[in-house]
Amino acid sequence: NIKKTTIYIKPDIKDYTVVSFDKGKEIIVKGEEATFAVYEQLKALTSETQRYQKPKMKVSSDSVFVTDIKVNELKNFTSAYVKGKLRFKPVTIITYDKLQSGINTINGTQNFNAINYALEPDGYGETLVLNLKENETKTLLKLGLHYDGLYKSAVLANISQKNLFFKNDNASLDLIIGDNLRYNLDYYVDNGFNISFGFKSTFAQFNRNVANSIQPGGIVGGDISLINIDFKDWTNQAYFQSVFVQKFLIGAGLEYKHLQIVPITIAKNSPDIDNSNYFSVFGYLKYDAFDNKYFPTKGWTFTGDIHSYLMSSNQTKTFNPFTILKADFAVAFKVIPKLVFKFQTDAGVSIGEKSVPFFDFVLGGYGFAPVNNFKPFYGYDFLSIGGDSYIKTAGTLDYEFYKKNHFNFSANFANIGDKIFSSLDWFSLPKYSGYAVGYGLETILGPIEVKYSWSPEDSKGFAWFSIGYVF
């Protein structure tokens, strides 16, 4: 009873909750301030002859044993969906940081208006009790802008619909209007740690001048150094995936792709470079712990992918079944406050008989949405160098000199060509290198980036602009 209390100390902690673990120092300061306010009253209670001896502090654990996870009944989502967003299962020891990260992930889905949770002792550990209030909004419309040197200017209209057919599902359509009409259609049923499934359909196109020598023997015959092409890619995937060891996304699926590459600068009635259908199976393993996709300050990512092309309508009469393996790893960390170093390495190889070159790895350019095996590379223009195998390493120093304003310096090195892993040549000094200095600004419309890039192998430099989220 407060009225019967001789000295009542009440810190001002109304801005904190029972899970404000990252605000511990601030909460302690609030307690000290409230205590010093009644210091004289406390001093009057002490004895000069028998001073209080503070016992040794017992450090409590920064982790908790979660024995069970209980979720209130939901109309449009299952408990498996919610537990999957937490990224940990019952009967698991987790840190409070991981608990907070899981709650933040649930909040980030924007599927719930209110999230109340508590840890309740159950004799063996703690039961995590979640009480969620669903967001009644199911249809969302979003708009976006983007510009890069490959797809040029684009306006995005995205419409998404939750619970279109089932609980936990989400359908999303990106209609991209601009210099190159494109779309992305995605339907996904998210069952958390259980097997989830989905369908993707994408259409991408662009027009570009490409060096005829980008592949051995040239893209077309004759004494032609540069070709203007229309590139069109229509890809459809059906896949399933799950969460592996509570961290990695692991999945597999089937793919149908139609690829059309038309030469514009050749004779009017010249045949298409390719106009074929391709059927393949694929598998992947993914992990992403970056705190920011475009300007990460901590975390790491990994992607491993295997793609086996089994059949084709074979318009070029040169198709043979083949498999592409590729992997990408990146890590970011702070060197000093405001200065971040990001290291990235990726590699790929084609296995099997000599086949069509249209799925070779192609390096060059920056800031574009990936399609097939086109990869960014500082120092070279878009789609400049290619081969059926490659290895690349890159490093970036990023300095945030003012809030959301970044200055960065990047360097990348690569070996690329046909069958480079059949000998130790890939382990030699890099054949290709490039550097870039840039400025980046984080805005509500996405990042705005300006980069100037050059290579010691070429006297020509490139200025690249990327505006808005990449799509």
How would you describe each model-predicted region?
Residues P271, F279, F333-V340, V356, ...:
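Outer-membrane beta-barrel transmembrane domain signature
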Residues G24-H146, N158-S160, S172-N191, T323-A327, ...:
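Periplasmic polypeptide-binding modules associated with outer-membrane biogenesis and secretion
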Residues K89-I93, L424-L429, G440:
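C-terminal soluble interaction/assembly domains
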